[in-house]
Amino acid sequence: MKKRIPTLLATMIASALYSHQGLAADLASQCMLGVPSYDRPLVKGDTNDLPVTINADNAKGNYPDDAVFTGNVDIMQGNSRLQADEVQLHQKQAEGQPEPVRTVDALGNVHYDDNQVILKGPKGWANLNTKDTNVWEGDYQMVGRQGRGKADLMKQRGENRYTILENGSFTSCLPGSDTWSVVGSEVIHDREEQVAEIWNARFKVGPVPIFYSPYLQLPVGDKRRSGFLIPNAKYTTKNYFEFYLPYYWNIAPNMDATITPHYMHRRGNIMWENEFRYLTQAGEGVMELDYLPSDKVYEDDHPKEGDKHRWLFYWQHSGVMDQVWRFNVDYTKVSDSSYFNDFDSKYGSSTDGYATQKFSVGYAVQNFDATVSTKQFQVFNDQNTSSYSAEPQLDVNYYHNDLGPFDTRIYGQAVHFVNTKDNMPEATRVHLEPTINLPLSNRWGSLNTEAKLMATHYQQTNLDSYNSDPNNKNKLEDSVNRVMPQFKVDGKLIFERDMAMLAPGYTQTLEPRVQYLYVPYRDQSGIYNYDSSLLQSDYNGLFRDRTYGGLDRIASANQVTTGVTTRIYDDAAVERFNVSVGQIYYFTESRTGDDNIKWENDDKTGSLVWAGDTYWRISERWGLRSGVQYDTRLDSVATSSSSLEYRRDQDRLVQLNYRYASPEYIQATLPSYYSTAEQYKNGINQVGAVASWPIADRWSIVGAYYFDTNSSKPADQMLGLQYNSCCYAIRVGYERKLNGWDNDKQHAIYDNAIGFNIELRGLSSNYGLGTQEMLRSNILPYQSSM
C-alpha cells in the first residue's frame, strides 16, 4: 500500500501536492537552471578498492607518514572530489589493521563534491578510508535537485548516507532568494531511511522566525513517515474561520492513519477527523470517524436536544479470500440529518439526500455465486420520512453455458423489507428467475433469443394502517404470488465502409439494432412498492428488459425497440465520431396495475420513448458530447445534456455545459423523500462553464459557474487564483455553493467559502499547477468531454 506523504518537512522543504505536468515541465526546467548536476562518469562499487589521484602545483612529504600539497590541490577517489589551496595528507598504520588510516586536512577555498552534495568552506577534513568529511563555516548545495543552506559545521558520515549540520539552515529557493528557510541547532539527514531529524527547529519567512519546535523527525523522500501534513485554513459563512492541522501516522507497512484537528470558530470547538487505512489478507479498506464534542450553533437551533455530539462514521471495504469469498462494506452514518449541510466531507454531501449502510458477504466459484447482504438508508429529511431496509437479502446465480447451442441461468433472491416507521407495510419477498438464451453471432452481426420465467412470492405484514387510509388507492394483500413469462429477440448488424472519397484512411460503421420484448400484464396493485423506481433511459437504456429497477414493479411489454448507431474511426482506429438514435414503439400499453403511477392511466401506445447520444472528437483539442431523452408518458423532454470542451493541455481548458431534467422525470426516478423536495419542484435547468488557464508567467486562474434558469439564480460558483514558483506556491480560492433549502422562507441556502493556501516547494519533482484538483473538488465537478 503506497502513499506519497507530503509532511511538515514537505511544508518546510518544498514537497508539492499536485501532479499535473502541463506548464509544470517548463517551471521544473527553469528551477533546475540554478541547480548543479553531476557531470562526471558515475563510478560504482567499493570506493576503497579505487585509487586516490592527487594533483597539485607543489608537493612535499615524509613518506609514508605525511605529505603536504599546495596550489590548486585536486584529490579524487571514485565519485568524491576534494579541492583546496592546501591539503595535508596523513597516513598512520593502526595496530592490528591491515590498511593504514589516511586522512586529509584542507585549508583555503575548500570544495568537496560527489554525486549527491557540494560542500564549500574555508576549512575541511576527510577520512579517505571511511569517506567521512567535515567542512567548517560553509555552504552546501544538493546535486541534481533543489536544496541548499549554510552551517557552522557540515559532516558527511556512513559512506555518504548521513549529512549532519550543526547550526545549519535549509531552503529550496534558488540562489539569491531566501523566501523561506529552516534553521536547526543540529540536522541529521538519513538518505537511506529518507528521514531528517531537526533539533531546535525554527521556520523562517525571510529573516523572521514564525515557528519553533524543539524536535522534529520528518520525511524527505517517498517512504511513508509519521509527521504533520500541510496545514490548511479557510473562511466560510457557515463555520467562519476554519483551520486544519493533519498528522500522518505510519502505523505499519499495511496500515496508516491521518488524524486532523479541525478548528471551527463559529462552532466553538475542534472536530477530530480520523481516517484509518488498512490492507490485510481479507481485503483493503478505509475507516473514518469524525467527532465534534459540542456545537454551539446546532445547540442554539435545537435547544431541546441539549449538548449535541455530532459525528460521522464511514467504512468502505473490499476484499477476496481464498479466491472464492468476497467481503464488501459501504457504510456511512451521521449523527443528524443536518450534518452534511454544516460540514464538508469527502464521504457525503447535502445533495445526496441519504446515506447508505450496506454489508455483504459473497461466495463465487465457476458457474455459481451467492451473496448475503443487509442494506439500510439514513434519510436526510426533517419531515420524518420513512425508508426501507433489506434485512437481510440473499442473491444466488447459477450459470450453465454451452448447453448445446443454449446458455442458461437461474437467478434467485430472498429478502426481508423493514421500514423505519412502525405503521408502514413490511414484507418478505422470494423471487426465482430461470433464463434460457440462444446466442448466434459472427463478425458482422448477432441474434440473441431469450426466454425467462419470473416467479415472485410476497408475504406482507403490518397492512392495517395502510389499507385503512382513504388516500391510498391500492389495497394491499397479505400473500401475493406473481408469475410472469418474458420473451425477447435482439438482433444487431454491423456494416462498414471505407471513407476514401471524403477522408482517406477513415472508416465508417452503420449498426442497426432491433429488439422485440413481450411480457404479459399482471396486476401488481396488491404489492407495495419497496424498492422499484423508473430507470433512466439513455440510448443503451432503450434496450433494457425492465422499465423499473427492483422487482416490485415489472411492467407489461409488447414493444419493439429500434435504433441505429454510426461511428467514424480514423486511420489509427481512434473513434472520432458517433451518434445513436432509438425509440420504443408500444403495441399495447405498458402497465403494472399500480394506480399511483399516473401515466398508466393515460392508455398511450405507439412511439412513446426516444433517446439519442452523440460524441464528436472534433480535433485533438475540441470535443462535444450530448444526449437527450423524450418520454411522451411524462409529456416532455425527460433529460438532456450537452458539453463542449476546448482542451489545449492539462492546465488550459474551457468547457461549456447544459443539463436539464424535467420535474416529472425527477419524481418518477428518485425516491419520494428526495424528488419531492422543494428545490426540485421545477426540475433542473442549468447552464454553466468551467475554465482553467495560465494568465501570466507562473500565474493561473480556474473557475466554474453554473446558473439555474428556473430560479434565475446561480447554482454554483468557484474561482481560484494560483501562483507557482520554484520554492513556494500560493492559492486563493472562493466558492459559493448550494447547501440546502429553507422550507419556511422557501429559498435556497448557499454557503460562501474563501480559502488561502501556501505550499513550499523543493525536493519534490512535482511542479504542477493543481488546476484539475480544484475543478474536480467543486460540488458540480469537472468531467472531461474528450
From Swiss-Prot:
Tell me one GO biological process term: lipopolysaccharide transport
Keywords of the record: Cell outer membrane, Disulfide bond, Membrane, Signal
Q: Does the keyword section mention Cytoplasm? A: no
What highest taxon heads this organism's lineage? Bacteria
Residue pairs linked by disulfide bridges in the UniProt entry: C31-C726, C173-C727
Q: How is it modified after translation?
A: Contains two intramolecular disulfide bonds.
In which compartments does the protein localize? Cell outer membrane
Q: What is its main location?
A: membrane
What InterPro entries does UniProt report for this protein, alphabetically?
LipoPS_assembly_LptD, LptD, LptD_C, OstA-like_N
Task: Please state the span of the N-terminal signal peptide per the UniProt entry.
Answer: 1-24
Q: Name one cellular component (GO) term.
A: transporter complex
Q: Mind telling me which NCBIfam families this protein's record contains?
A: PRK03761.1 (NF002997)
Q: What does this protein do?
A: Together with LptE, is involved in the assembly of lipopolysaccharide (LPS) at the surface of the outer membrane.
Q: Which family does it belong to?
A: Belongs to the LptD family.
Q: Which PANTHER family match?
A: LPS-ASSEMBLY PROTEIN, LPS-ASSEMBLY PROTEIN LPTD
Under the subunit heading, UniProt states: Component of the lipopolysaccharide transport and assembly complex. Interacts with LptE and LptA.
Protein's UniProt name: LPS-assembly protein LptD
Organism name: Salmonella typhimurium (strain LT2 / SGSC1412 / ATCC 700720)
